[in-house]
Structure formats: structure tokens, C-alpha cells
Amino acid sequence: TAACAVIISQGASIQFVKLTTSLIYLIRPILLQIYVDRNYQIDKKIEYKEEPIKQKWNGVAQHVAAVVLDGTDTIVLTVFSSLSNVSIYSVYHLVIYGVKQLFTSMTNGIQSLMGELWARQELDELRDFFGWVEWSIHTGAVLVFSCTGALVVSFIGIYTNCVTDANYIQPLFAVLLVLANAVHCLRMPYNLMILAGGHYKQTQNNYIVAAIMNITVSIVLVKAAGLIGVAIGTLVAMLYQTVWMANY
């Protein structure tokens, strides 16, 4: 972020900015490789007798379902609606997704600490820590997304000023999309605990059902309600997943 800010302030082209970002991201795996080679003796020729990662395909299934869940709206709008709706959705998604990513980036490292406490079976400490994480994430999500919901339409109005290809002022759609992403963040403490505990197999059906639910509701409603339809589909899927995870 700092490098991009400096380069942009110097008037560099977008191509150079993206090249700089790519090179910075490339440095991390190289440094990790150097660190691992220096500090760990890994026998790459060893043969194992049983599957070392027992739930890896369950994890893959979860990840695929999560990708489908996140990408459903754009695909449904592209196939069943107009390109102007795709454009409107993309602008709102750019802003709201950025807010969500900024919020979720603050939780980096929490999962590993939960996993360590779970592995050591320090359950009292885990309960206390989880309670703090749950309160912090829920309070932060309510605060951040309340501000987002109040400001996003005005921001989009300024951002798309003089753009006449579509009507970008969509208050109801904005509220629904903000709610869907807020609910997605509300489920984070439960999702972090599930992943920290390694319960991939036990919870993969939840991800699959949520993805199917999002696709089905979005396709059914998109013809009649357009952007509102896909936003409702996403919100319904997120609500289902959050309630299920909290109960689990």
C-alpha cells in the first residue's frame, strides 16, 4: 500500500503500479522458501504409507464452494440480466468488498492462535479468547458496515459523476449488498474456529448448500428484480451459513 501510494503520487502509469505490486507479492514466497531451506531439513524423497492430510479433499470442496458463493452474482447477472446491471454491481462490489477485505485483514493470525489452543486442549483459555474475538468482530462489523451503508450511495454518486451508461444510484441494492457482506463478517469467528479445529469434513455440506442456495435464489429472482434479486440471493445464503456455523 505504501509503495503504491508513493508511486501513484509520482504520476506513474497504472501498468507500473501493478508491476510494482506484483513484484512485492513475489518477494514473500521467495523469502519464505529461503527461511524454510535454512531452518528445516526436509526429506523430499520420503515415501508415506497413509494420507498425511486426511481431509484435504474436504478442504478443497469447501474452497470451491466458497469461490462459487462469492462469484455467483456476477455470473448470474451476466447470463440472465443486462450488462448495465453487471456494471452497477461491479462498482458497488468494488467498494463494499474493499471494506470487507480491510476488515477481515485485521483478523490475520487469530486462526493459528485458536488452533494452538485447541491442539493443546486449553479449553478454558480458548473459550475466553473466542468470546473476545466474537465480541470484537461483531462490534467492529456492525460499526464498519453501518458507516458503509450510510455512505456508500453518496460515494458511488461522486465516483460515477458524469457517467451516463447506467443509473448507479441504487439505495435498496446498496443496503442489501452491505447487509450480505456484514453477515459474511459476522460469521468469521465461527468460521475461524471451524478451520482452526480442522473440521473440514463435518462442515463441507454447509458451504455446498449455501452456494446452491445462492445460485438458486439469484436465478429465480434476477428476472423479476434484477440487481435486487441477486443481492437477496447472496443475503439469504450468508444468513443461512452464519446461523448454521454459529449453531455448530
Tell where the protein language model's regions lie, with residue ranges.
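Membrane-interface junctions at transmembrane-helix termini in multi-pass inner-membrane proteins
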Residues: T1, A12-Q15, V36, Y40, ...
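Alpha-helical transmembrane segments of multi-pass membrane transport and lipid-handling proteins
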Residues: V6, F130-C185, I215-A224
